[in-house]
Design a protein with these regions (language model features):
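N-terminal glycine-rich anion-binding loop in soluble enzyme alpha/beta folds
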Residues: 2-63, 68
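Mixed-charge interfacial surface used for oligomerization/domain docking
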Residues: 4, 10-24, 29, 89-92, ...
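Short catalytic-loop micro-motif centered on adjacent basic/acidic residues
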Residues: 60, 82, 114, 231-232
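Active-site cofactor/cluster-binding pocket
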Residues: 64-80, 84-106
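A structural signal for short coil/turn segments at secondary-structure junctions
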Residues: 76-77, 107, 225, 252
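A ubiquitous short alpha-helical element
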Residues: 84, 111-118
């Protein structure tokens, strides 16, 4: 095997990636009250969303241990990569770096690189697919790293939340503001900063108007999109994801489109009805 990519479980894998031994997932764990949930193939989104809705505090996540990454890197692949959730949002990047160093202490000849996605969810998915594209084009390890780093810098993440409870529970939105926003049906349009943290771009009354604003932002910020892959991730709302896809494709050209359902960590952030767009 020439290369292997480990993606932490905030990044959803496509069905094809799940069947490809060159891709692996490093599971984060989620805590809702006394319940500990592993974000792997056993994750039950509907059950998780019910638990989150019923629990008064914000769910918590714990990143994969360095040993999990270490074990993932202990393979005969020539080139090894990890793609993690933004280091501004999680300790997964630091954990992967520690896992890499544990392997290099024993095998200094190995070629391993950890990418800080500065994104989340399908942003990580697209980065993993970019690594595959570079490897299959026959690039040297150092050229893959350079090309993918440049791709990460060009990538933008956007999302709209139907449900503001996670923002309220984690303190990003006060209870009063959350109540007012919910009463007025105000939905925030969010995005990523260049450093990989979260910012509010805009807001609108009603989910559909917020989605239109998000589409406007994507179109405005991506004038040269014809060679890019568009990725959309939804939390339990496939029809909404399809609507966003159609609205974007009416206004811009892209190379391909991927639509996936949120796994565990992304479900925690997006909550029921949330939409994430990365390009």
């Amino acid at each position: 095997m020439k290369f292997k990519v480990i993606v932490d479980s905030c990044g959803e894998l496509t069905p094809e990636m799940k069947q490809d031994e060159r891709f692996a997932s490093a599971a984060l764990t989620l805590e809702v009250g006394a319940d500990t949930i592993v974000d792997d193939e056993t994750f039950d989104q509907a059950d998780f969303l019910r638990k989150v809705a019923a629990y008064p505090e914000c769910p918590k996540s714990a990143c994969p241990s360095p040993e999990i990454y270490q074990k993932g890197f202990e393979t005969d692949a020539e080139h090894l990569y990890a793609v993690t959730l933004s280091s501004e949002l999680s300790g997964s990047y630091n954990s992967a770096e520690l896992g890499k160093n544990l392997v290099l202490e024993e095998h200094p000849e190995k070629k391993i690189h950890v990418f800080n996605s500065k994104s989340a969810s399908v942003g990580e998915t697209l980065i993993a697919l970019k690594i595959q594209e570079c490897e299959e084009a026959g690039m040297e390890f150092e050229q893959v790293v350079e090309t993918v780093d440049a791709y990460i810098e060009s990538q933008h993440t956007y999302f709209v939340l139907e449900n503001l409870e996670t923002l309220r529970k984690n303190g990003r939105l006060s209870r009063v503001k959350a109540l007012v926003a919910s009463a007025l049906k105000i939905k925030p349009v969010m995005g990523s900063t260049p450093e990989g943290s979260i910012c509010q771009l805009d807001q609108a009354r009603g989910i559909n108007k917020a989605l239109v604003k998000m589409v406007d932002y994507v179109k405005e910020r991506e004038p040269h999109s014809s060679d890019k892959v568009l990725a959309i991730c939804h939390c339990n709302c496939p029809e909404r994801a399809q609507m966003v896809k159609e609205a974007l494709l009416e206004r811009m050209q892209v190379k391909d489109v991927i639509i996936l359902d949120t796994a565990g960590v992304s479900s925690m952030y997006a909550n029921d009805g949330g939409i994430i767009v990365v390009i």
